[in-house]
Amino acid sequence: MKIVVDADACPVKGIIERLAKEHQIEVIMFIDTSHELYSDYSKIITVSKAPDAVDFALLNQTSPNDIVVTQDYGVAAMALGKKAKALHPSGKIFTNDNINQMLFERHIAKEQRRHGKQNLHSKNNKKRTTGDDIHFESSLNELLKSISS
């Protein structure tokens, strides 16, 4: 088991590394060439800035029972298809029971934006809080315990 992270805009890299160290779990963080990231613990893989390059590199390194941290519902769905666990930086655990609804809602929002309707992203962009970090940490701990038991 390892933790693989879509690290380009991931706000919880520090929490991931701290918990991974405590549980002695490998972490691989994926970024594109427009970002720089250094770590004394995690392996950093830098890929081209091509569309979805980070997503495909991350998924190529994902195995069953890995934990994938991503904000991308499509990546989460593919990770679940590979029998991995998937976790949003908000702490929401993606499951086979909720991913289809999330993908459908993403599709509807995209269609509304395409037709010039209200941008649903802008009104939901709240600043990250300490509570968000606590929720993420709790969810990651939950996944780590479920996999190791």
Swiss-Prot record:
It comes from Lachnoclostridium phytofermentans (strain ATCC 700394 / DSM 18823 / ISDg) (Clostridium phytofermentans). Pfam families: DUF188 (PF02639). This is UPF0178 protein Cphy_3042. NCBIfam families: PRK00124.1. InterPro entries: UPF0178 (IPR003791). PANTHER family: UPF0178 PROTEIN YAII. It comes from the Bacteria. Residues 112-132 are annotated as: Disordered. Belongs to the UPF0178 family. Residues 112-128 have a biased composition (Basic residues).
